[in-house]
Amino acid sequence: MKKLQASVRSHKKQPANHKRRRTRALSSSQAKPSSLDGLAKQKREELLQASVSPYHLFSDVADVTAFRSNLLSWYDQEKRDLPWRNLAKEEANSDRRAYAVWVSEVMLQQTQVATVIDYYTRWMQKWPKLQDLASASLEEVNQLWSGLGYYSRGRRLQEGARKVVEELGGHMPRTAETLQQLLPGVGRYTAGAIASIAFDQVTGVVDGNVLRVLCRVRAIGADPTSTLVSHHLWNLAQQLVDPARPGDFNQAAMELGATVCTPQRPLCSHCPVQSLCRAYQRVQRGQLSALPGRPDIEECALNTRQCQLCLTSSSPWDPSMGVANFPRKASRRPPREEYSATCVVEQPGAIGGPLVLLVQRPDSGLLAGLWEFPSVTLEPSEQHQHKALLQELQRWCGPLPAIRLQHLGEVIHIFSHIKLTYQVYSLALDQAPASTAPPGARWLTWEEFCNAAVSTAMKKVFRMYEDHRQGTRKGSKRSQVCPPSSRKKPSLGQQVLDTFFQRHIPTDKPNSTTQ
């Protein structure tokens, strides 16, 4: 760390053209706007600069250079060995390289690295090229994606692959702008990640990890979801990205946020850009305030009420939080509550054992195209759920005995914006229904169910049914139909795969003033 700090001090002597370079570092673009949109954008830039203190900027080109150098040196030594990084580095074909990055970035959205590794490996083994994915069926895509969540990601990924093959001659767009414009489901971040990692385009990215790093190094405490703050963060990312190694730089910034500059208990003493971090400096100022003499540490020159990037008066600095004061979490609406009744219908099977009935969800909306047990949506005070569910079952199976419909309990599953409570029922048939399953329905063995394109919520329902059918208590030993990967998540005391890809670092608390 002393070497890293020394590299910052080494930039005190500035060349003769420093003033010109510093001016360039302050602005991401000096181009004269050629349209009304360009003029509007320039006006927004001017208003933003007028309301922002240099405290929240990288005003000195020496700091930009040091940030790049220190971060990349750390990344070269500490980066995790991940399959998508190896593919991006080793693949000579630029289209395959871009495809490999694309798949990883889509899978990593809202999903932990440890979870993605297995899915990514199986995906690339099954569909190593864009053309392979384009020719696959949506059912195959949903089946492999089962359990990963946010299922529209897989569908849009395949839609994008088909567009590249059918409309773009099999060649991926080469820039962040065209990637975002031409490919469905590709937003600004994903486009920038693909363009910088696969094609070396000098473009910055801002994901959740980068956002946290930037908010801390420049002490940005305003709502990170606001248009003004988001615009400022993207400007910072574009200013900082290393022109010689844009892909590595972006991955390094994400890696720093994921492994060192974490949401809770960040490892500040191991941070390669600690000496440039405003949040860390503020913690140090608090710790040194009791010593003789006031430490010379820069602060925001504007009044807090004037600066639109500082912590607000309604949410001031909390010494106990340390650097975790940044970024401040935006208020989130609680997920809306919905209720459903679902039933596991079983009929006697042959060699493969009993069969359960699955029906396919609509092609759009929540869990589009996935398979589930027959279900009906209920009102919270629904008094006749038994009758409503039986009517739904008869739609798929024909006349059924109501007296055999048995209530097993309830399963709660929380999606990103919905808390869904399932009332779980079972119905055992003595023989197969008189009619065959209609379109949109099918009978599967237990083993087939575990490998089908079903949601995690349905696997929870099936586990309740499994436990009840086998007459076992929760936690007792029994044979498992579904493989462990599709069952419960590891407990808090159990190591997850991600831990094997991190260098062991002892926990410290340099971010707290209560040391």
Swiss-Prot record:
Residue span of region Disordered: 1-38, 468-494
Domain of life: Eukaryota
Compositional bias ranges of the Basic residues kind: 1-24
Molecular function as annotated in GO: 4 iron, 4 sulfur cluster binding; DNA binding; DNA N-glycosylase activity; metal ion binding; MutSalpha complex binding; purine-specific mismatch base pair DNA N-glycosylase activity
CDD domains: ENDO3c, NUDIX_DNA_Glycosylase_C-MutY
EC number, as in UniProt: 3.2.2.31
Broad enzyme group: hydrolase
Matches recorded under PANTHER family: ADENINE DNA GLYCOSYLASE
Cited function: Involved in oxidative DNA damage repair. Initiates repair of A*oxoG to C*G by removing the inappropriately paired adenine base from the DNA backbone. Possesses both adenine and 2-OH-A DNA glycosylase activities.
Family statement drawn from the similarity comment of this UniProt entry: Belongs to the Nth/MutY family.
Protein name in UniProt: Adenine DNA glycosylase
